[in-house]
Amino acid sequence: MFELQQIIVEPREIDQFYRVGEIENKEADSLSNYFFCLKTEDGKQSALAYYNDETGKLELLKTKELQYQGFKPRDGAQSCLFWALKNNDLIVGLGSAGTGKTTVALAYALNELHRNAKNIVLCKPTTFVGMKSNAIGAIPGDHREKLEGYMDSYFTAMKKIMGETFEHHLYQLEEEDRIVFKPFELLRGQHFENSVVIIDEAQNTTPHELLTAISRVGANSTLIILGDPDQIDSGLKREETGLWELIHSDAFGECPFAVAIKLTAQYRSAMAHLAQEIIEELRAKNEDEEDSND
């Protein structure tokens, strides 16, 4: 669900799709997916598409402008996520570690910062592995120092996009309040307008916490929610998390400005691949045990 769905078509259909820009919704499962990859059986021709709710057709997803500075999407799903960010207000990027969802989100956010956004707000639940509470008080240091460990994934992504000088640029943007790091538990009472708000590791939130954060986002803003439903550090079950409740709600599915996509291709080490395979095996085992107990 939410993955880039593959549809095999004839070469002439690919050619026509590029000419006309739309195609009949042949085998697309538009109830579970929004993005599609049309490809020939030999894999030599392909095109990305998105489902148009109003026409019921698949429309061509143009990828030429989907890049920023040192960033360019590495696969079809990353291209679809970047496109979704440019064309929607609420976007959920799903995927395991190494799929590039944070890098794609930040590339879009930095692009918007240079265009018309007032600032970028970076959030993340402050949860250690195995802990159930979100709190930063126990960590030594001032507010900025406390956040550095939690926000490291953002720094890593910025370095990929900006290069070695990212620390200098980041310092300037922070001084001007154009990039703001916010502890997740301090979002209550905040209100963000004309901003790009990114919430990473959303699988570690409760439904109440995530919905509270969503309610803080105001006019002319984009909210990007990132997470991996299968890697939860907060002690919650997958179905109890805010991320899971959000993407499986009827309201989200029917919302005209909300979309979700799952990234699956990993660009990390073989060790990271192994960890993900083990996580998936354990999840499948737990689901089988739960089914047998019902």
What is each residue range found by the language model?
Residues 1-5, 13-16, 67-71, 75-196, ...:
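Conserved helicase motor core of SF1/SF2 NTP-dependent helicases
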